[in-house]
Amino acid sequence: MRLLWLLATVVALTSAGILKDAPKKRYENFRVYKLTIQNEFQLAVIEKIAELSEKYNIWKDYDEHTKQLDIMVSPEELKHFQNLIMFNNIGSELMIENVQERIDEEQVTATADDATFGWTKYYELEEIEAWLDQIVDAYPTVTEKFIVGESYEGRTIQGIKISHKTGNPGIFIESNIHAREWITSASATWFINQLLTSQDAEVRNLAESYDWHIVPVFNVDGFVHSHEKDRMWRKTRQPHATNACIGADANRNFNSHWLENNGASSNPCSETFAGDTPESEPEAKALAEYLTTNKEKFNVYISFHSYGQYLLSPYGHTKEEFPENYADILTIGKAFADAIEGLPYGTVYQYGSTADVLYVASGSSVDWVFNELDKKIGYTIEYRDKGRYGFILPPVQIIPNCEELMVGMRALIEKTKELGYL
């Protein structure tokens, strides 16, 4: 009982802000390895050490097709980790030698050009929200802000609607549900800007033929924490009464096959913790309520993530079943991937159901929209790269990534319309 009381006290103090003055977490000499897993025992060994110790962090879950996963290792555990993988005959490739160096490189030095919002650096929440205000002021006849709801820490979850005419079919984009995936909100704001300012005929047609509902930063609390305290933070920020670990994976917290088939974790310290109950996180509950209320306003749902270069579709909770319209879903996915691969960058995207192409993930927003709101076209876009930088994608890659997004989205929407879903 005393242990439970102490844990609850720590959580309460943290929630009250007493412990929030802790210094920003540094990742000096933390390494990221890509491991090649040959059997279930090896996988269990790696997943167990990651779940039991905060000195390990799985960046990219096990992919059954490549037989690989990415894991970050603290310098204190490095020798033990190297012995462990050698003893268990697990293949490894060093992807990042010093995570903190990558983080430091990501922080672009301010220049005179930074007086205006752009896409050569990553921005904090207040800067993104201020830019949204400027956009609405600059384009009052075709834009309006909307509020999805409120986060645990009391921040508003803001979005922008772009609409050129009444009666357009709608597309909803949710971004940065995982806090550390900064490329997602950067891509969302770039996409908004292009819809409003581009003079390209195909982009103008895309902008004016559909209503766009875009939430650049969904996990607002986690996003702020990732900027101010811990660059590698993923989850929400709601504490738990009986555990010192904070937050849940909001993308495992939706009430669609919640916690099924090991597609999430019941451990509050896990990065894929599903929450205490479905929609236990205020953010997930708010989005579910908002989308339910406004379900007639959109036909397609897209969720921005990183990393790995995938276009993932339902189902996430099982690879034994597929949606009735899976052939159409794959046709659209191929159009997206082919369009991106046709660019000079040569970036390759895999496409298919989450569970089949990548891993089982239950309780995701895309699956919830598909199953509960009957929206039959929904995708998770996992942006660059394949692991060389992972979540810490250099700012110089923001615009190339966004260019891939635009050609991919144009192809995706065109094929979706051709097949009769828009």
What are these language model-derived features?
Residues R2-L7, A12-L422:
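M14 metallocarboxypeptidase catalytic domain recognition
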